[in-house]
C-alpha cells in the first residue's frame, strides 16, 4: 500500500488527510489552494466564470509553488485529460510558473489519440499515465530539475468513468472506479520507483476536493466519518517533526510541498498554509476547522 511508503502526517496506522475549505472545494479552487495557499473566493473571481472554458483567471499578487520553482530553474509540465481552459486552469498555470500544458486538445493535435476520440472529460486516466511516463523520461534526460503535475479525472462525479482496466469487484460502479484508480496510481508510482531519476524525486499524491455525489455518500459512507482528501508524500528527503495526527487543510500543501523538496522556509508558513514537516501549528490546529472555514 502506498500509504505505508509515505507520509500523511498521522501518528499511527490510521489514515489521515486534509480538510477542504470553502473556495478550495472544486477543481480549479483546489489546484490554486494547494499551490498558493489561498482560498479562491468571490473577492478574487466570479465563480460562474469557472464553470466553463475561460482565459480570464488572472490572480495578481500571489507567489505560488510554480513561481518559486520557475525562479529556481525548474521545467514544469501540467498534464490533464480534459481541456486545460476549463475553469481557467491554463491561464493560472501559464501565468504562475510558465508550465507547459498537455491536455485533451494537445493529444488530438499531436495524434496521441485518434481524431474525434473523446471519452468522459476527454481521454481517460489510463492514457494519461502512459503519456506521463514518456514525458517523465524525456524530462529526466534534461539538465534542469522538473515538476511534472498530473490531474486525473476518472473518479469525478457522477459515478466515475469505467475504463478497460476496471474490474467488477463491487456492487456499485463508483467503488469499482475507485479501486481501479488506486491500482493505476500505485502502478505509476511503482514505475517511477524503478527509474534512475527516482532517487532524487519526491512524489506528492493528493486529492483535489471531496466527492460530490450525495447519493453515493449517503449510501456508502458512515455519517460520523470525517471526510478528508487523500495526502501522501513519498521519498521526501526530510522527516516529520510533529508525530501526532496533524489537523490540516489542502492550503498547507503549498509550503509542505516545497519543504518536501528540501526547501528551507523562513517561519514555516506561506499564504495561509503551514509546513507540516515542521512543529508549527496549522490554522486548524490553532482555531479549529469550523472557525477558519467560516472566515
Regions found by a protein language model. Name each.
Residues 1-295:
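Solvent-exposed soluble domains appended to multi-pass membrane proteins
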